[in-house]
Amino acid sequence: IVLSKQRGLVCHPAHGHESGTLANALVYHCGIDHLGTVQGEDRPGIVHRLDRDTSGLMLAAKDDDTQRALQNLIRTRTLDRRYITLVHGHIAMDEGTINTGIARSTRDRVKMAVSDDPFARQAITTFKVLERFDSTRFDDGYTLVECHLFTGRTHQIRVHMRHINHACVGDPLYGKCDARADQGLTRQFLEIAACPACHS
């Protein structure tokens, strides 16, 4: 199943979000017996997730074999997961790779952070600059970037962009404190660019 997830929608039940999730909607429309259960009963059919405030196309599976096969494509990096984000400032390089560990922040447990802790999980993001925009009174310009995920860590793009000092515009967790620099955006400017697709 290919789904268009709206911003603000949580993918699966978790503390504080027991109902009204994408997983709940899948069960309502398909029935629990017609969804993959590889991820457990609280994530029926879910192949991969998107952060609550990230919108775009997602994949869900109607049976365990399909769910396993799609997740294997993600693990082996066969699925192309590209995102578009607008970040603060002008990124000097036209393209690059960010390869770090990511773990939960020791200062704020809501956040993730780049970490060299041995228990941090490897996270790899490549980026390509699409366009640079002029500066304003409140910011030193913006860069429209295409990001390609080779791993799928929580808040990965948001953490990596912040790590290189180019936080996503409108990001309430990792962004700038001055809301005027977000140009009136009330949510993070981060979208999945296209449906994950298999490339040979």
Set out the residue ranges of the language-model regions:
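A generic structural signal for short beta-strands and their flanking turns/coil linkers
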Residues: R7, L79-Y83, D94, I98-T100, ...
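Small-residue-enriched segments and motifs
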Residues: P44-G45, T125-F127
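Short coil-to-beta-strand transition motifs
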Residues: S115-T125, L190-E191, A197
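RNA pseudouridine synthases
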Residues: I1-K111, P118, D134, F138
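Beta-strand secondary-structure signal
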Residues: V2, L59, I84, N99, ...
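Conserved hydrophobic positions within beta-strands
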Residues: V87, T126-V129, C168
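Pseudouridine synthase
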Residues: E18-L26, C30, D64, R75, ...
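Solvent-exposed residues in well-ordered beta-strands and their adjoining turns
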Residues: H88, A92, L130, H148-F150, ...
